[in-house]
């Protein structure tokens, strides 16, 4: 008896590019930064990251299972990445209950309130981070200084970050320039700050991994970093006493982390290469404005969230032409 022909709907050819595959690559790309943060801040970095990831997983499971009454979505690893990125935006000595609150806001409000993965207009981890920054400003701006593996989680010594010092210099306190760490320490990762801000080098390694795996393209990271470099470079040339070398901006704060791992989120970023470039330029511009003229020393989180809101307009403006459509 002849074998029956089974006909299915398209697509018939698959490239193997799945959500799980891309998320897995992102997790691997974040691991070098986590390892370096452990050597810089000690066990506190691991405690904060583990608490954040477990909290995000729990809240996504609970909301999906008991409120939305849908099958579990933990397998797509998006909640895991949200947990890691939220932790990377926190100091390594933050109280555990604040991490849980941040995870609840990130998953419950930033993601699941809009329907889950693929529907959220804002980056969930940044929603949680900004909520904590506004609600607990003292704890969220208390940065442990590098103390190595033996650093205490509870009694960690705190100090100013490079961005704090850059802001003081721009405000007229030029003596703060003597306290700035060397560019080498900033690049390698021997300075205070959030868990994920410690080393520009390992974050760039993560960028290479994501580019080689074709998880992201160059458009967003390069446009953000280029915009920040150009704007801060111009300010430095105009007044080198008040404005620091642009390399300090590129290696300080959450710029690298945000440009590589957060602004490139598929759901909350533009769909076309042209749109991605304009999106990145907007983030870079807002970051510089907030860093120098805002109330907070770091502007990356606010810049990304603001540009997340503009993404629908960018997508509409940068809509690709239909095949055969005449130029307007």
Residue ranges of predicted features:
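Cytosolic-side transmembrane-helix boundaries in multi-pass membrane proteins
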Residues: 1-24, 292-328
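Long hydrophobic alpha-helical segments that form multi-pass transmembrane helix bundles
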Residues: 124-204
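N-terminal signal-anchor module of multipass membrane proteins
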Residues: 1-57
């Amino acid at each position: 008896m002849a074998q029956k022909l089974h006909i299915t709907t398209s697509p018939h050819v698959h490239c193997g590019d799945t959500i799980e595959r891309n998320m897995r690559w992102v997790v691997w790309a974040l691991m070098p930064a986590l390892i370096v943060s452990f050597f810089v801040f000690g066990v506190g970095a691991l405690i904060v990251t583990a608490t954040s990831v477990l909290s995000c997983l729990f809240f996504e499971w609970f909301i999906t299972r008991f409120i939305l009454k849908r099958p579990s979505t933990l397998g797509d690893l998006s909640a895991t990445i949200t947990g890691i990125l939220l932790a990377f935006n926190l100091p390594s000595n933050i109280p555990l209950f604040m991490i849980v609150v941040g995870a609840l806001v990130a998953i419950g409000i930033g993601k699941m309130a809009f329907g889950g993965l693929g529907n959220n207009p804002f980056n969930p981890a940044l929603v949680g981070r900004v909520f904590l920054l506004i609600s607990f400003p003292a704890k969220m701006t208390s940065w442990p200084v590098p103390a190595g593996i033996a650093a205490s989680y509870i009694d960690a010594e705190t100090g100013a970050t490079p961005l704090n010092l850059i802001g003081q210099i721009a405000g007229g306190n030029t003596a703060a320039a003597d306290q700035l760490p060397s560019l080498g320490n900033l690049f390698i990762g021997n300075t205070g700050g959030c868990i994920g801000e410690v080393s520009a080098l390992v974050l760039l390694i993560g960028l290479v991994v994501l580019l080689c795996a074709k998880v992201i393209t160059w458009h967003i990271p390069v446009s953000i970093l280029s915009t920040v470099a150009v704007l801060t470079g111009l300010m430095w040339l105009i007044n080198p006493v008040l404005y620091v070398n642009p390399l300090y901006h590129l290696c300080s704060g959450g710029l690298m982390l945000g440009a590589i791992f957060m602004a490139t989120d598929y759901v909350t970023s533009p769909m076309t290469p042209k749109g991605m470039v304009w999106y990145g330029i907007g983030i870079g511009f807002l970051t510089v404005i907030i860093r120098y003229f805002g109330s907070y020393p770091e502007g990356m989180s606010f810049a990304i969230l603001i540009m997340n809101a503009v993404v629908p307009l960018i997508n509409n403006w940068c809509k690709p032409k239909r095949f055969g459509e005449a130029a307007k």
